[in-house]
Amino acid sequence: MKILFTLCGRAGSKGVKGKNARDFLDVPLVWYSMANIALYMERYGAADDIKVVLNTDSEPLKDLVRRVKDVPVTIIHREEHLAGDRVPKVAVILDSLIKAEEAFARKFDMVVDLDITSPLRTVQDVKNAIERKQQRPEVEVVYSVAPSRRNPYFNMVKEENGFFCKAIPSNFTTRQEAPVFYDMNASIYAYSPDALRNKEHSTFFNSNCDAVVMKDTGILDIDSEEDYELMQVIAKYLYENEGSFKETFTKANSWK
């Protein structure tokens, strides 16, 4: 199978300045995603033709990626029209696919995007997403989710006409009775290349999708300095106490 791994990170960031090129527990944040790729290639990728690209307009991020010799990465400079706040990431991944096909003179069977700001991901999570996409070729994308701690039928509310009410009106009296919901954690996406080319980006995730479930720590987003500090506390515990997370940290830390 021909797999294209994409890493996408722009220079600008509203919440945490330059977060894509920052250190996380004294290791460059992007190296955790690269460690996932390296471990996948070592453990499961012997029969696959795997390429990796970085799509960015950040020179510091380019330099960090170039320092890792274990994972050869082709750098795609992000065009200005794809670097704005309102540009959907799917458009950037499509740009990566088109330019990778030109650079490597081949078509890919799957595009796997690993979010740079998701360091709490294991190689097994990556394998699960790729395997699910292989098992279900009819779906257009398999993405990662985590169990939701709140449920719109039971304990989520909205403001309406000056009052608060349940997000979805219901007669459920316990959370266990309500339909199960998941958080899209934006960590892993395994795409069909044809869907990237042909599906409307603004409604891409409204239909024909499947998901793999990750540990619920994977719902943390780095959108503020407080998020950044809190995630490092949680990550330190996981890297020290859980083997599947520890191997990712060990691999990333070995490149220092």
Model-derived segments and their meaning:
Residues 1-17:
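N-terminal nucleotide-binding beta1-loop-alpha1 segment
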Residues 2-7, 30, 37, 51-54:
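Hydrophobic targeting segments
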Residues 3-4, 110-112:
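Structural motif
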Residues 48-53, 217-218:
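Short active-site oxyanion
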Residues 53, 57-110, 124-131:
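Short phosphate-binding loop-to-helix
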